[in-house]
């Protein structure tokens, strides 16, 4: 087994600020649809998928604003039940709004996500979970 040994005369001190996790942030952003109260989020990473999810929430009627580096999401007037392909096609995480919309409104329409650079990642696990909860669904074109 290889190892890296570091020799130095000084103790390491200080602080670093790490970015939040994209894969943790995306489901949290989708879950904000479940409440009509304001949600305050800190330390979201500045990556394209997060920006796209924020745009998707806005398209569903969420009011979103930044105060410094914090994000405030207000879904008190969120009333749309359709997640368009234009936004969902660019990230796999778009499917994550399906459950919250279904819970909130009793029905929802979410375009299936587009392709993925790292290969096929079907959404069937989401559909199977919904079926086990008694949800019926239809997949159609357009």
Language-model regions: role of each:
Residues 1-142:
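Structural preference for solvent-exposed beta-strand-turn elements
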């Amino acid at each position: 087994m290889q190892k890296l040994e570091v020799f130095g005369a000084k103790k390491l001190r200080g602080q670093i600020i790490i970015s939040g996790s994209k894969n943790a942030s995306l489901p949290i952003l989708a879950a904000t649809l479940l409440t009509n109260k304001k949600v305050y989020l800190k330390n979201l990473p500045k990556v394209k998928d997060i920006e796209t999810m924020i745009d998707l929430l806005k398209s569903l009627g969420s009011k979103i604003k930044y105060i410094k580096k914090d994000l405030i999401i207000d879904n008190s007037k969120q009333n749309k039940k359709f997640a368009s392909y234009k936004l969902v096609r660019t990230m796999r995480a778009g499917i994550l709004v399906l459950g919250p919309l279904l819970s909130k409104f009793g029905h929802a329409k979410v375009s299936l996500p587009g392709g993925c650079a790292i290969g096929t990642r079907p959404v069937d696990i989401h559909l199977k979970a919904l079926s086990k909860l008694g949800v019926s669904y239809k997949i159609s074109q357009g």
